[in-house]
Structure formats: C-alpha cells, structure tokens
Amino acid sequence: LSKVDLDVLQLHGTEDITDYRIFKKDIIKTLHVSKDSVFISKNLDFENTDFLLDTSSENLQGGSGQCFDWKILNDVPVEKLFIAGGLKPDNIIDLLSKYTPKCVDVSSGIENKIGHKDHNLMSDFVDKIRAY
C-alpha cells in the first residue's frame, strides 16, 4: 500500500478492521448478511469506516442475486451503509423509499446472463435512482 495512493480500502474477508487502521485510509468493510443476521448499531461504529451489506447464501458470499431481509436495516445507521444483494431495476425504488443508504451496489441485477451486463438494465437502474 505504500506504493499506491489509494483513497479507500474495501475489505471482503474475515479480517479485523482494526488491523487496517495503520494505513490511515477510509475503509469499506463487507458484511455478509444471512437470514439469521442481526446487527447492533455499536458494532457498525468505527471511525472512517462504512459497511457494505451483501446477501450471503449457502454457496456464495455475495453475487447470489438474492436480497437479504431489509428489515434488519430498521435499527442501524443506514446512512453509513452500502447496500448490495439482489438489487435490480424492479426493486431499487422499494429500497430507496424505505431507507437512505450511503450507496447501492448492483451487479447481477443488471445482467442479461451470468457475467454479462445489459446496457438497458443498467440505464433503467440508474434512471430510476436519478428520478427518485
């Protein structure tokens, strides 16, 4: 990290956030949400850290195309969260009408087949967010 000038570190594993404080960079820490996940607000309170919540499934840590139960967002500081997991043009307004995340992350929700982004789906997704 001393050789590149990064603004943000995005962590996807089981690493401890505090181990990365020495780099003095903002952090986005991915948390994988399962049907049994519970988040306590104090667990999401780290200086210069945002959290990306993504759906965990039996076989995948993200990329499943499935939404997690957004009700878990009711008791956490959503404005610090990046929301991922099953987002697509058909449900993005439903999310935004209930919660105000810092950012949304879309991947498979704008694909017409696995690994192939669809320009029309991408435009539809972005247009809906902008219009909202």
Map each language-model feature to its residues.
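Short loop-to-alpha-helix "cap/lid" segments that border enzyme active sites
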Residues: 3, 14-108, 112-132
